[in-house]
A protein has these predicted regions:
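Alpha/beta-hydrolase fold nucleophile elbow
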Residues: 124-135
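Short beta-strand/loop motif that positions the catalytic acidic residue
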Residues: 246-248
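Cap/lid segment of the alpha/beta-hydrolase catalytic domain
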Residues: 48-114, 118-120, 291-298
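Conserved alpha/beta-hydrolase "acid-adjacent" motif
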Residues: 254-259
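N-terminal cap/lid segment of alpha/beta-hydrolase-fold proteins
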Residues: 1-39
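Accessory cap/linker subdomain of secreted extracellular hydrolases
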Residues: 27, 56, 69-75, 81, ...
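Conserved small/polar residues in nucleotide/adenosyl-binding loops
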Residues: 326-333
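Glycine-rich nucleophile elbow surrounding the catalytic serine of serine-hydrolase chemistry
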Residues: 134-143
Length: 343
């Protein structure tokens, strides 16, 4: 698309509780922002993706100033020119953000909230922030919504987590990846051979593997509040005043549909404006036909191909963000139809 915007890098400083160890109390969040080419004095809303995959040596991704090929490029080309800013934000312990990868714990949550406030309070911002992302990046919107931040107007979680333990323990069973999710999957994030690597030695980084192993063995929180700290939905229902556009593949074998249903019913019951887009795809965005075909099989969604591909999804997103970020939120419709509860 035409280069109608410029991307710049910023650090957001915030105070970390000293008990978080690592880099506390001096938290620092790394982000990049693209602002559309608009007349001087015009303010615009912000669409932001928060996650661990920007500028991260562990997964060999480019600098955060380059839009992510998985989502950022599409937003820059198809939505930003309509008068939206876009931001990519590294969660704590990843990319150029300091501290440690505490896997969605308190430090990460506080960093997410600080970045939302920063994005909503800049001179070029109209004060409204929307968050979007898939998988890990679809879990950070739930984290942000816990705080009731006045700038957070809408979130679009795509196959995101309402809680970390809820991902891997369900109906009396434990997934094989459960004991190693913290340091086995994300343990190398933020470790790149510089002097800031010492900041990764925060308490939760050390406790995480033992807590995962204990829950795998006994099925519950054996000690402490590691899992309670990483359950988001209860605080969202209590504090959030924005809207939710919830997206979920019903053949997602990574983040199962129980993250979306009956979650959407609980949003309705809490009088939170919500919309759901659920389809017969795997751990994907709704408009990616090649991935949908490659990740499906007979009996696992391929029967619905290509009818389940939503090539109108970016247009749908544009209309959603325009309505929610540029105008006052519509009255909450208490007559929303309910989805059936999951088994």
């Amino acid at each position: 698309g035409a280069q109608l915007w410029s991307g710049t890098h910023h650090f957001v400083d915030f105070e970390l509780p000293i008990e978080e160890g690592g880099a506390a109390p001096n938290g620092k969040v790394s982000l990049a922002v693209w602002i559309p080419d608009v007349p001087e004095g015009t303010t615009v809303p912000v669409i932001a993706e928060f996650g661990p995959y920007f500028d991260e040596a562990s997964v060999e991704t480019p600098g955060i100033e380059e839009p992510g090929t998985w989502l950022g490029t599409m937003i820059l080309e198809q939505i930003v020119p309509h008068g939206f800013a876009f931001a990519q934000v590294s969660v704590m312990g990843t990319g150029r953000s300091n501290h440690c990868m505490d896997l969605m714990g308190t430090a990460e949550q506080l960093g997410v909230d600080a970045a939302v406030t920063w994005l909503g309070s800049q001179d070029w911002s109209n004060g409204n922030v929307g968050m979007i992302g898939k998988s890990y990046d679809g879990s950070t919107p739930w984290q942000a919504a816990m705080f009731g931040n006045e700038h957070l107007t809408t979130i679009v979680p795509i196959s995101g987590l309402i809680g970390v333990m809820e991902l891997m323990w369900r109906n009396g069973s434990s997934e094989a990846r459960a004991p190693i999710m913290h340091n086995g999957v994300y343990g190398s994030y933020g470790i790149d051979g510089d002097l800031e690597d010492a900041g990764n030695m925060c308490p939760d980084y050390l406790v995480g593997p033992a807590t995962g192993g204990a829950a795998w063995a006994w099925g519950s929180e054996a000690a402490g509040d590691y899992w309670g700290e990483r359950y988001f939905l209860d605080r969202v229902l209590e504090n959030y005043e924005g809207s939710v556009y919830l997206i979920q593949g019903m053949h997602d074998w990574n983040v199962d549909p129980h993250m979306a249903i009956p979650t959407i019913n609980r949003l309705y019951d809490a009088d939170i404006e919500a919309k759901g887009l659920f389809g017969q795809w795997d751990h994907d965005y709704p408009d990616r036909p090649q991935q949908m075909y490659d990740r499906s099989a007979d009996g696992r969604g391929r029967e619905a191909f290509p009818e389940m591909v939503r090539m109108d999804w970016m247009q749908d997103l544009l209309e959603w963000f325009t309505c929610l970020l540029y105008t006052s939120p519509s009255p909450r419709d208490k007559r929303q139809s309910r989805m059936p509860s999951s088994a």
